[in-house]
């Protein structure tokens, strides 16, 4: 039996559920609804965000790698953004007038989350390609359609990378 283990880091993108509780979906939903955007702590903690297409490409490369490469291999984006930067980008991309509100940081919340993707680069020749702005634009587009049933046609909503399989 072939075994591959990948460790996934903070993935976002179209087809996320609006109530999944993750920071990207929370901020987008709050901004689109004109609600205050809730930041826990001072917002200077950092996170990295991996767009779903990049994740899928990394996973497919791992699945198609030689049998002696089993992992674990980190699949994520090592570029860090503060939570404040993320909130401000979401406000900008949605055109929202949302205000930022700050609540106490949970005691177990790390100041930084950033994957080391050295093995993915070395063994799979993989690195993320989608910049945060582009990924957020696609994700906001999806959420607008999902939340408001806008005039967005399904074929206009970006689709994640789909591999072609041969028989």
Predicted ranges, named:
Residues 15-19:
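Short, solvent-exposed loop/turn segments at secondary-structure boundaries
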Residues 22:
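Acidic donor-binding loop at a coil-to-helix junction in glycosyltransferase catalytic cores
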């Amino acid at each position: 039996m072939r075994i591959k283990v990948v460790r996934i880091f903070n993935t976002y993108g179209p087809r996320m559920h609006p109530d999944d509780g993750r920071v990207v979906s929370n901020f987008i939903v709050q901004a689109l609804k004109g609600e205050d955007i809730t930041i826990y702590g001072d917002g200077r903690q950092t996170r990295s965000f991996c767009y779903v297409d990049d994740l899928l490409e990394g996973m497919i490369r791992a699945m198609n790698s030689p049998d002696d490469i089993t992992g674990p291999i980190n699949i994520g984006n090592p570029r860090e953004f503060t939570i404040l930067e993320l909130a401000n980008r979401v406000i900008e991309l949605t055109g929202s007038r949302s205000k930022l509100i700050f609540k106490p940081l949970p005691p177990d919340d790390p100041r930084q989350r950033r994957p080391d993707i050295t093995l993915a680069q070395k063994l799979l020749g993989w690195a993320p390609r989608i910049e945060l702005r582009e990924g957020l634009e696609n994700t906001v587009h999806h959420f607008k359609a999902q939340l408001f049933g806008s005039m967005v046609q399904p074929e206009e909503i970006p689709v994640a990378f789909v591999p072609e399989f041969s028989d």
